Each structure stands twice: as structure tokens, then as C-alpha cells.
Amino acid sequence: MGHFTEEDKATITSLWGKVNVEDAGGETLGRLLVVYPWTQRFFDSFGNLSSASAIMGNPKVKAHGKKVLTSLGDAIKNLDDLKGTFAQLSELHCDKLHVDPENFRLLGNVLVTVLAIHFGKEFTPEVQASWQKMVAGVASALSSRYH
């Protein structure tokens, strides 16, 4: 996990303040399920995931995506302690849900793509670098309880 500079923190926090958590969360999780279809097996209870349009319109996907990004908001407030912030979620995803930790990295990369789409020119290479560092840190923290 990289160390966050004050500039990284300011960059991440500034953009995060403009993110519509509900929309971006649903789009991020939806894209993950479409682009990496093997991740769908963790969401059997979500109903129809048979096509891209079914996934992107699925209210359970949108609701869980919002939940995921809401917890990411907690991480943004605690960038210096991502491992502590995600200790319980790491345990849940490891011990109970048996999620492949690689999926956390994939989700982070999809989020960066969604932010780039939504923010266009504002999502400069410097902004992307800070966000990539953050999503990598979150993926690492979520993977920390795996053995």
C-alpha cells in the first residue's frame, strides 16, 4: 500500500465531493459484472443478470453499488488506516463470502474508468494516479484477512 501525500489526499477528497455515490456505485458494480462475468457468481440473489441491460438496470446491483461506494467514502476519510477501516469487511468477504481478492482490484479499476468517463478532462493523469493509488490501497486492505 502506497503512502498518500497531502496532494493525493486533497486530489482524492476534492473529486470524491463531486461523485454521485448512487449513480457511480451502480455503474461501477454493473460494469464489473458485465466486463468480468465470472464475478456474477457472488450475486446469485440479485435476480436477472442475463445481459448487460438487465445488469445495468437491476435495482439490487444499483443498491449494492451504492453500498460499496459508501464504504469507499469511509476509506477516503481514513486514508492513513485503510487496513483498519476495512478489517471487518475483509473478514466478511474472506471467511463468509469467499470472494476472490483479485475482484477488489478489478472493482477499483472499473471505478477509475467510471470516474474518467464522468469527469472527462477534469480526470487528469495526476488525478488518475492518486485514485489508482487509493483503489490499490483499498484492494490491499480488503485482501488483508485472507490466508
UniProtKB/Swiss-Prot annotation:
List of residues binding heme b: 64, 93
GO molecular function: haptoglobin binding; heme binding; hemoglobin alpha binding; metal ion binding; organic acid binding; oxygen binding; oxygen carrier activity; peroxidase activity
UniProt-listed GO biological process terms: hydrogen peroxide catabolic process
Keywords assigned by UniProt, alphabetized: Heme, Iron, Metal-binding, Oxygen transport, Transport
Superkingdom classification of source: Eukaryota
Tissue expression profile of the protein: Red blood cells.
Pfam families: Globin (PF00042)
Gene Ontology cellular component annotations, sorted alphabetically: blood microparticle; haptoglobin-hemoglobin complex; hemoglobin complex
Family matches, as InterPro entries: Globin, Globin-like_sf, Globin/Proto, Hemoglobin_b, Hemoglobin_oxygen_transport
Role description: Gamma chains make up the fetal hemoglobin F, in combination with alpha chains.
The protein's assembly and partners: Heterotetramer of two alpha chains and two gamma chains in fetal hemoglobin (Hb F).
Family: Belongs to the globin family.
The protein, known as: Hemoglobin subunit gamma
Organism for this UniProt entry: Papio cynocephalus
Phylogenetic placement of the source organism: Eukaryota, Metazoa, Chordata, Craniata, Vertebrata
